[in-house]
């Protein structure tokens, strides 16, 4: 039920919490079916908290390894990262809701690349080139306003607190910029990412 297929785009996104029987067992199977059909397949998964049962973490690590073999791109969100952004009064349901929001943002961010107008519009072929057979990925979303809004937004995007990845060493990058910004704003944002990833964008 968590499988999302975007009509007409030929891509499949699999959102899943790893560690339990359903996600760990089913996710790699669904991903393989999609990839075998030649469909761009993106996995977005969570790792359980370290305080959960050791077997659950071991299952999650094994499941992530299997799903990585059967998706083009994989985004991993460790639940432990929630401990860095919530206070002691945050309840477990509230914390898990934040993790789910990041999962949703990851999927939404990719579809928005194609569907929403931007300074330079992308099509599915652009996304496919960057995401096909690429392995672990980093994705982030930022939003800001004011004089340095573009730079502030991209700084938010590359430093997502709930991901264990960074863009350092990235071989491919897509930057999607939208809003009322100037050419210089867009250049500042792209230059910032280029310096961090040390690649040509």
Regions found by a protein language model. Name each.
Residues 2-13, 199-200:
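Single conserved hydrophobic/aromatic residue that forms the stacking wall/gate
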Residues 11-19, 45-47, 138-140, 173-178:
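Short glycine-rich or small-residue beta-strand-to-loop segments that form or flank ligand, phosphate
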Residues 11-14, 33-122, 126-131:
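N-terminal glycine-/lysine-enriched basic segments
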Residues 19-30, 52:
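Short glycine/serine/threonine-rich phosphate/pyrophosphate-binding segments
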Residues 29-33, 60, 190-194:
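Short, solvent-exposed amphipathic alpha-helical segments in soluble enzyme
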Residues 81-198:
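Glycine-rich phosphate/diphosphate-binding loops and the adjacent beta-loop-alpha structural elements
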């Amino acid at each position: 039920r968590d499988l999302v297929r975007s009509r007409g785009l030929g891509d499949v996104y699999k959102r899943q919490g790893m560690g339990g029987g359903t996600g760990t067992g089913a996710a790699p199977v669904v991903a393989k079916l999609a990839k075998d059909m030649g469909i761009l397949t993106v996995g977005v998964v969570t790792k359980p908290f370290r305080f959960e049962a050791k077997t659950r973490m071991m299952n999650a690590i094994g499941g992530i390894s299997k799903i990585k073999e059967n998706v083009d791109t994989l985004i991993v969100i460790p639940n432990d990262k929630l401990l860095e952004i919530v206070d002691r009064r945050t309840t477990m349901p509230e914390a898990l809701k934040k993790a789910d929001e990041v999962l949703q943002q990851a999927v939404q961010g990719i579809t928005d690349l194609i569907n929403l107008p931007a300074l330079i519009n992308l099509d599915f072929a652009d996304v496919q080139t960057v995401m096909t057979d690429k392995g672990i990925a980093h994705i982030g979303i930022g939003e800001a306003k004011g004089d340095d809004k573009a730079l502030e937004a991209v700084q938010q995007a590359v430093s997502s607190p709930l991901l264990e990845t960074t863009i350092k060493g990235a071989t491919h990058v897509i930057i999607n910029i939208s809003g009322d910004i100037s050419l210089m704003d867009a250049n500042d944002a792209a230059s910032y990412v280029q310096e961090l990833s040390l690649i040509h964008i």
